[in-house]
């Protein structure tokens, strides 16, 4: 009996069965990959996006795969909509939430001198304000679950300079620091907080830009761009009971880019 119980505990360390999760921006890209990863591992997932049509298309695919996913329309740059989202999540999951993945985000690439006040406000609201406010709103639900995990989807632009815009980099750097602060403050509530920082990930936009492709491959020791499921797997790991002593960390998923000192890949 003792051996059977030990085996069950070991199995549960690598499962999200019975857990609840909220993933913002889950209708495409990294967010969609995260939703599918968590659901595949047994979690009940709620996700949101601005585009209802895209959400419904995803729902049909998820239902066909047997995933338990609910959805709602939400623009995370809106404080009122964030509050309505969390009220909805609290109702669906009976006041308890195990996992929050603040994934929704956006970017505007311009020289710093060309940014407008509207650009600044929009990027801050979508990337940083939403991550802070949703974490704040989710705190009582995460605490009530007895074991909570927050993952902030940041970027390597929050760790090193990348030519994608100073405001975007500032929001992502702030998210990394937010994860550290919340990890320390909320550890007593058994809530862990980490940030994940992807480098360029394969998307149609990226794949159609040959110059960008060449530059990324030159600067990445592994010589290739990453795939969405190589990021979602880390997000899932950070939510496993097996990761119960990992908190306050900023983890790059970048094929070695951030430790490459911006060196171009040599021709051998």
Curated annotation (Swiss-Prot):
InterPro entries: NAD(P)-bd_dom_sf, Sc_DH/Rdtase_CS, SDR_fam, TR. The keyword NADP applies. NADP(+) binds at residues 22-46. It comes from the Eukaryota. The keyword Oxidoreductase applies. The active site is at 168 (proton acceptor). Substrate binds at residue 155. Belongs to the short-chain dehydrogenases/reductases (SDR) family. SDR65C subfamily. This is Tropinone reductase homolog At2g29170. It comes from Arabidopsis thaliana.
């Amino acid at each position: 009996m003792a051996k059977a119980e030990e085996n069950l505990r070991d199995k549960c360390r690598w499962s999200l069965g019975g857990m609840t999760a909220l993933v913002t921006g889950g209708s495409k890209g990294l967010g969609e990959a995260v939703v599918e990863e968590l659901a595949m591992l047994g979690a009940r997932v709620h996700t949101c996006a601005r585009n209802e049509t895209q959400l419904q298309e995803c729902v049909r695919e998820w239902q066909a795969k047997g995933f338990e996913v609910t959805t709602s329309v939400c623009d995370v740059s809106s404080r009122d909509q964030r509050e309505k989202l969390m009220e909805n999540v609290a109702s669906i999951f009976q006041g308890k939430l195990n996992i929050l993945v603040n994934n929704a985000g956006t970017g505007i690439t311009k020289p710093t001198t060309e940014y407008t006040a509207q650009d600044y406000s929009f990027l801050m609201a979508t990337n940083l304000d939403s991550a802070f406010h949703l974490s704040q709103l989710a705190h009582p639900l995460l605490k009530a679950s007895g074991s909570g995990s927050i993952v902030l989807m940041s970027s390597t632009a929050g760790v090193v300079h990348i030519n994608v815009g100073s405001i975007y980099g500032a929001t992502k750097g702030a998210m990394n620091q937010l994860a550290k602060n919340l990890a320390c403050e909320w550890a007593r509530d058994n809530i862990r907080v980490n940030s994940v920082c992807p480098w360029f990930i394969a998307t149609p936009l990226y794949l159609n830009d040959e110059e960008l492709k060449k530059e990324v491959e030159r600067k990445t020791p592994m010589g290739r761009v990453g795939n969405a499921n190589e990021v979602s797997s880390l997000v899932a790991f950070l939510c496993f009971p097996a990761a119960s002593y990992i908190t306050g960390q900023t983890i790059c998923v970048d094929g070695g880019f951030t430790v490459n000192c911006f060196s171009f890949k040599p021709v051998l």
